Regions:
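Accessory cap/linker subdomain of secreted extracellular hydrolases
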Residues: 31-58, 127, 131-137, 143, ...
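N-terminal cap/lid segment of alpha/beta-hydrolase-fold proteins
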Residues: 50-99
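Gly/Ser-rich "nucleophile elbow"/oxyanion-hole loop immediately N-terminal to the catalytic nucleophile
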Residues: 96-101, 162-169, 176-197
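Cap/lid segment of the alpha/beta-hydrolase catalytic domain
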Residues: 106-182, 358-372
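A catalytic-pocket lid/entrance helix-loop region that shapes and gates access to the active site
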Residues: 169, 194, 198-263, 313, ...
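Short beta-strand/loop motif that positions the catalytic acidic residue
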Residues: 309-311
Length: 440
């Protein structure tokens, strides 16, 4: 343990419009006595010994032995030529207080990455706590009375069916897992989905299904819509050609079980990337494919929970326009606030990483987050998320302040009511006036 100094310069921009005073909360009341005030966190001792952040106080409970479940889902008509039923496989760990009959909420990681890879070189299955994201939940939240669930999407690990790569079938399977987790006799009925990248996309897939059990999502650089991820300003990224086929080949076991994965949605996915890459906007046929894989627009008005958005502002994999972009004139972050959703954000100058992933917060060039590295890692992330989950999954503690924590390019952190600030000046830039020097 050593005293953290990463927030010592935090919030120096408080005089700016849209910032919160140190004693304010979303409800306008001071709740400083319940949790340490965010402005005092730089004075606290944080556990810097591991590879991820820890909560301030250890929990009183222990994790019970892993349990597994298989959920059979009616998939009639979901996949062209696919099976009429398919299984979703998941593993889960309960805290020891469930032995006394206490009901607990669930934090789920929903992923295609369990048993992912070629035979003989696969990642761990769902019944082993996943490195990083699973361990973070297991060590921080299970001792405080939360269940951890690891869910394999259709056609991955021991789940069956077709891998339609974020399509309607995958969304149905995720929804079925959320419903199952919320309906168990040990569950208090409240489920969260947490994860980065694809595992953040599954949070939006679940939100688009509108389960009453899904109370909050924490997408960390999570894809919100596939087409804007791969196609920007009329041009395509090279990876767009192989996204579906790359995942599809990595989940094959090269045995008879792979026959379940031969359905038209999979074939369409193999064609969609190269076709759109080659033809661009001259390819209207594939619009249906990409529309099916846009989830943030479908979730708006259907999802009935909160959102804690985490985004690397230097992320070139799932870049920030997935949060702050959208159709012309749309900023999804603000659109959800305007629609009445309870939204918070942690927006750092890291790349495609977690807020506390210090092992990755060290290799960014000047102008691409390098100036912020010294103050980048958020060792308070575990506590910050704990306070969020306590309120939205258990109804315990004060309502979190619904603000955006944003890191400047020089490393300083500040709080804004939203991002970008509503009173920001937008200055048009005429690119024809910019002179680009020839390389010497």
């Amino acid at each position: 343990m050593r005293q953290a100094t990463f927030l010592a310069l935090m919030f120096l921009m408080l005089p700016l419009s849209g910032c919160f005073s140190p004693a304010s909360t979303a409800d306008g009341d001071s709740d400083d006595a319940y949790y340490p005030n965010i402005y005092d966190r730089h004075n606290l001792d944080w556990n810097w010994d591991g590879t991820y952040a820890m909560v301030l106080e250890p929990g009183p409970f222990e994790a019970l032995e892993v349990q597994e479940a298989t959920i059979t889902v009616d998939t009639t008509g979901v996949w062209g030529g696919g099976p009429n039923s398919a299984d979703v496989h998941l593993s889960y760990w309960l805290p020891s207080n469930t032995q006394a009959g206490e009901k607990v909420p669930v934090i789920a990681v929903v992923s295609p990455y369990f048993s992912y890879g070629q035979p003989g070189d696969e990642s761990n299955p769902t019944n082993i706590v996943a490195a990083g994201r699973g361990e973070f939940i297991y060590d921080n939240f299970v001792p405080h009375g939360y269940a951890l669930a690891q869910v394999a999407v259709f056609a991955t690990e021991e789940s069956t069916g077709c891998f339609d790569y974020r399509g309607d079938g995958e969304g149905l399977g995720i929804h079925s897992a959320v419903e199952w987790l919320g309906d168990q006799n040990w569950s208090n009925g409240n489920v969260a989905i947490y994860g980065k990248s694809y595992e953040g996309a599954t949070a939006w897939e679940a939100a688009a299904q509108g389960s009453d059990h899904l109370k909050t999502i924490v997408p960390i650089s999570g894809t919100t819509a596939l087409a804007p991820l791969l196609y920007k300003n009329g041009s395509a990224e090279a990876r767009s050609q192989i996204m579906h086929s790359n995942y599809g080949s990595s989940i094959l076991d090269y045995d008879d079980d792979d026959l379940d994965n031969l359905c038209s949605d999979v074939v369409e996915g193999f064609l969609a990337g190269p076709t759109r890459y080659g033809l661009g906007e001259l390819d209207p046929y594939m619009d249906n494919y990409y529309d099916e894989r846009s989830h943030i627009d479908k979730a708006l008005g259907k999802y009935n929970g909160s959102i804690y958005w985490v985004q690397g502002m230097q992320d070139w994999n799932v870049d920030p326009h997935q949060v702050f972009g959208g159709p012309p004139g749309t900023n999804w972050y603000q659109a959800y606030i305007d629609a009445g959703y309870e939204v918070a954000g942690m927006l750092g100058q890291w790349e495609h990483n977690y807020p506390d992933q210090w092992t990755k917060h060290n290799n960014q060039a000047s102008g691409y987050g390098g100036e912020a590295i010294h103050n980048m890692t958020r060792w308070d992330w575990g506590q910050d998320l704990f306070e969020w989950m306590e309120y939205y999954l258990k109804g315990v503690g004060p309502k979190p302040t619904l603000h955006a924590q944003i890191q400047r390019n020089d490393g300083e952190w500040r709080i804004e009511e939203t991002w970008p600030p509503l009173d920001a000046d937008r200055v048009p830039l005429d690119l024809s006036l910019i002179h680009i020097s020839e390389p010497t």
